[in-house]
């Protein structure tokens, strides 16, 4: 393909080092699609005849079928997926195969392949995130008005609806999908026609070429088109953040499924046992989901580091973009169905959650009670803090303090202060949009259904 100016063959060690076919062969669909579109444009531009175009297309269809049916036979000399397909095409149709690469460089060819592959990966991962959202929403709808402790710093904070907590993970997943949508816009840009660096001299209709390949736009600059993989980095950032969100959900589920909490029981199908301890039921599904976040972050850092040091235009360093790209997509395509399944089959223990609520979580409500009677919040905060300390010293719940102690805490306190020690009342008071009151949560559920295209 490129050996004409060389007097010696490539060293076997260098050939192995240079060879990307073992991993980039998975882009065979995209490479053949791009080559078929390019053949049509070569004929449209008068560079090849319609007969030659049809011969090339027929040959490429045969190569496609060989890959699709796992019958493609690679050769040791196949440097990458592009050379492998071109070599096989030559075996099938003869010398006319040599015309396919007219006006095209592997630089714009591979950039196109990677963009097409990434577009497909974005759609598959979006489907996976949506399935997780559906599982979260279904559980939220089933939870009704069940209360659970809300935690900050992993300390009991305020009562919230179980559905409210479930939906918190729904909305982070929704932003993940929005980021994927944005990433798709910048990925769906056609580099083909950019050549090696300066653009093709042929009268190629790049807009028609983009439409043929299902891409939304054409690249405005040939140097940028062949050299930048910012769309890969952006995709990997989206993937890494999805991993982080999966990790946070997993951490919650791991904690809540422990015997110390007992808020959730994981299905056997998403748990494992111990080789030694017969009683163990381990949340391995969520532990693995938590662990994958580090891998996804590593894929992002790999590509950012590759991109950092290279000058303008194409450099061989860019071959290193594919393995982290493929790894991140593979990881999420494996992880997301597990996450959705583990959430969908989990059984939430409303009784255990209710039992974990304690009066100290209503301290803010007591402060709000004083604020409603004209006490500045900072003063009210201090007053209730003293009451909490008094309850701790007596070893009783906040609501179990003698009424005279409560009344003596501040002149604004009346006997009706006892009304604040009601968990359901506490949640119901938080009625602003996005809050945990049952009505507000029902509004969230309606919005969530709309996000999923439901009514």
From Swiss-Prot:
Gene3D superfamilies: Fumarase/aspartase (C-terminal domain), Fumarase/aspartase (Central domain), Fumarase/aspartase (N-terminal domain). It is found in: Cytoplasm. It comes from the Bacteria. It is an enzyme of class 4 (lyase). Pathway: Amino-acid biosynthesis; L-arginine biosynthesis; L-arginine from L-ornithine and carbamoyl phosphate: step 3/3. GO terms for biological process: arginine biosynthetic process via ornithine; L-arginine biosynthetic process. The keyword S-adenosyl-L-methionine does not apply. Its main location: cytoplasm. InterPro entries: Arg_succ_lyase_C, Argininosuccinate_lyase, Fumarase/histidase_N, Fumarate_lyase_CS, Fumarate_lyase_fam, Fumarate_lyase_N, L-Aspartase-like. This is Argininosuccinate lyase. It comes from Roseiflexus castenholzii (strain DSM 13941 / HLO8). The gene is argH.
């Amino acid at each position: 393909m490129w050996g004409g100016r060389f007097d010696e063959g490539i060293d076997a060690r260098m050939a192995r080092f240079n060879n990307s076919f073992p991993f980039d062969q998975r882009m065979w669909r995209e490479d053949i699609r791009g080559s078929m579109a390019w053949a049509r444009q070569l004929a449209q531009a008068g560079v090849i005849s319609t007969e030659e175009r049809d011969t090339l297309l027929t040959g490429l269809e045969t190569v496609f079928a060989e890959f699709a049916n796992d019958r493609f036979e690679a050769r040791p000399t196949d440097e990458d997926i592009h050379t492998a397909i071109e070599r096989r095409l030559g075996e099938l149709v003869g010398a006319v195969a040599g015309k396919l690469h007219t006006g095209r460089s592997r630089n714009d060819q591979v950039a196109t392949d990677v963009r097409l592959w990434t577009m497909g990966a974005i759609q598959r991962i979006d489907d996976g995130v949506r399935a997780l959202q559906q599982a979260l929403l279904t559980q939220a709808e089933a939870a009704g008005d069940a209360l659970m402790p809300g935690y900050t710093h992993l300390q009991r904070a305020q009562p919230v609806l179980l559905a409210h907590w479930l939906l918190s993970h729904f909305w982070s997943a929704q932003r993940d999908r929005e980021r994927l949508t944005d990433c798709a816009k910048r990925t769906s840009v056609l580099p083909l026609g950019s050549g090696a660096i300066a653009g093709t001299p042929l009268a190629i209709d790049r807009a028609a070429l983009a439409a043929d390949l299902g891409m939304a736009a054409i690249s405005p600059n040939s140097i940028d088109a062949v050299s930048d993989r910012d769309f890969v980095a952006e995709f990997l950032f989206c993937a890494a953040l999805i991993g982080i969100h999966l990790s946070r959900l997993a951490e919650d589920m791991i904690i809540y499924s422990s015997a110390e909490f007992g808020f959730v029981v994981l299905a056997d199908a998403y748990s494992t046992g111990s080789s030694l301890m017969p009683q163990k039921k381990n949340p391995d599904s969520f532990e693995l989901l938590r662990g994958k976040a580090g891998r996804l972050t590593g894929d992002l850092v790999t590509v950012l580091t590759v991109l950092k040091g290279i000058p303008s235009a194409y450099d061989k360093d860019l071959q290193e973009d594919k393995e982290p790209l493929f790894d991140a997509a593979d990881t999420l395509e494996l992880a997301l169905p597990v996450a959705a399944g583990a959430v969908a089959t989990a059984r939430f223990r409303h009784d255990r959650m209710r039992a974990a609520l304690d009066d100290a979580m209503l301290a803010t409500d007591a402060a709000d009670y004083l604020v409603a009677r004209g006490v500045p919040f900072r003063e009210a905060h201090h007053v209730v803090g003293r009451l909490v300390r008094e309850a701790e010293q007596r070893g009783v719940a906040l609501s179990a303090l003698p009424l005279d102690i409560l009344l003596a805490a501040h002149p604004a306190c009346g006997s009706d202060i006892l009304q604040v020690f009601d968990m359901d009342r506490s949640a119901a008071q938080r009625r602003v949009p996005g809050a945990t009151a049952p009505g507000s949560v029902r509004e969230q559920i309606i919005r969530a259904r709309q996000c999923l295209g439901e009514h």
